Each structure stands twice: as structure tokens, then as C-alpha cells.
Amino acid sequence: MPALLMKKITLLIISDLHAGSTVGLCPPKFQLPDGGTYGLSHAQQWLYQNWNDLGQQAVKSAKGGKFYLISNGDLIDGKVKQSVQTVTDSMVAQREIATELLDPLVQKADKFFVIRGTEAHVGGIAQHEEGIGKDFGAEKSESGTYSHWQLLADFGGVLFDFAHHVGGGGRPWTSGGNAVRLAAETVMDYAGERIPQLVFRSHVHKYADSFTNVKQTRAIITPAWQLRTAYGYRIAARPADVGGVIVTIEAGRADVDVVLYKPERTAVWHEK
């Protein structure tokens, strides 16, 4: 077996931080552009606590090998049309929030990859994610940018396909169908070529997994780090899924660990 395949590689795949959102991930006591300090809500404290827990799990899993961090899109919330659920509309400040959250993990990572998210959040041609990637010295795309619309990567002999966008799966009765469909589409798209064994998408804030439904590939829709927005309450009764994915690659095989943290449902009102 080639020496490259003998090396252990651990990936931490995170997405949809939506830094700058009042229901997104944020470090405690963040200083706003005008000098004030933003204090976390109870829900954001819960998010931050679990974010640190996920990072600790990933770093522990990576001991004795390489550690790669992959951000699969929507690092910041941006200035979304008609939304008032932002800590600040300053894109500089939102990027600083994302940078502060990522920095401890990037410092421990051997490589950092930035996948481009939704332009409504991260700017035209994902300019803010490109900027964050450049600031951290993230791995470059074949065109020389510090972020990728799509990343096709061989890690330890396992072929991965990363991109941000995917559709469907928002209703309970269709949950998981988007992952199975994505896996099947991947097999057809790569017909006659090497087929990615693991495919990752994000965007919908609902975890889904094709598991073994499609023999040649497995598709995973990642959980997010933003709780339900006003828009989320309008389109779905259940909370967003929160968490990330840790993949350990050894001897050309990948072991997938999906780490989920369960948000509380809306509290039941009781007659007093």
C-alpha cells in the first residue's frame, strides 16, 4: 500500500455558520463597530458551547494524523433583503465574527478549505468567503482563488465532492430524499469516470444521509450552525439541525461520524 494511503487524515466539515445573524453562531462579547459589545442570547450561548465541543472532538480524533478543516459555505449571514435579524450590517464586522470563530480550528488544522455559499449571504461571487479564505491562507482552487464553488479532492485514497447548494428535503415526509437523489445523480454525472465515494452538500440546514441506498457513493447534507430565522419559522415546524461531520480516513477507507446537537422545540404554554 502506498505510504500516502497509510497516513491517517481527519476531516471536520462544517457549514452555515451565518456569522452576524442574531440566531447564528457568535463568540461571546463581540465588539461592534461603534464600540458597543454584543452579548449572546441564551440560544447563541448554547450554539457556542456546542461549537467548542465539536472542535474538541475533531481535534481529539485527529491525533496521530493530519487534520483538515472544510467550511462548506455561508460563513456569514450578510445583509439579507428584508431581514432585520443581524447583529450588525457591517460586512467587516461579520467577517471578524467568522474569523474569530474559525481561528482556533484553523490554527490546529494542517489544511483549510473554503467552499463558496449563497451570494445573498456571502456577497457576489462569494467575495466575503474569498476574503476570509485569503486571510487564513486557505487552499487555492485551480484558478488561484482561496475559495471553491466545488471541490473534488482525493484525501487518503478516498474521493470527495464538496459544494454548498442542494435542494429539497424541507418537509418531514421528504426528509432524506434529497440525499438519496443526490447520490444517484452523482453516480450518473460521473458515469465512465471515477465516482466520488462521499458527496457533501449543505444550505438547507437539515441533516440528511443516503447511507447505503446508492451502492457506489454516499451523499450527506450537513447540519448548520444557525437556528430558525423568521423565514425558517414560516417554512418549517421543526428546528434546524445543528452540528458537523467528522470523517476519519485510514488505509483508503473513510469512517463517518455525524455529530448532532438537538435544539429545544418551542416551549409548551401552560394555563396558570
Task: Locate each region found by the language model.
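Conserved beta-sheet core of the metallophosphoesterase superfamily
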Residues: L159-D161, V166-V258
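A short C-terminal boundary segment appended to hydrolase-like catalytic domains
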Residues: A251-K272
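Active-site metal-binding loops of divalent metal-dependent hydrolases
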Residues: I14-H18, G73-I76, G117-A120, H165-G167, ...
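N-terminal active-site segment of His-dependent metallophosphoesterases
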Residues: M1-A93
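Beta-strand-turn-beta hairpins that frame and shape the catalytic cleft
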Residues: A3-L12, L152-D161, V214-T217
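Residue-level marker for buried hydrophobic side chains located in beta-strands
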Residues: L11-I13, L69-S71, V114, D161, ...
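A structural motif corresponding to the C-terminal end of an alpha-helix
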Residues: Q57-F67, E100-F113, E193-I195, E250-G252
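Active-site neighborhood of divalent metal-dependent phosphoester bond hydrolases
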Residues: Y48, I76-G144
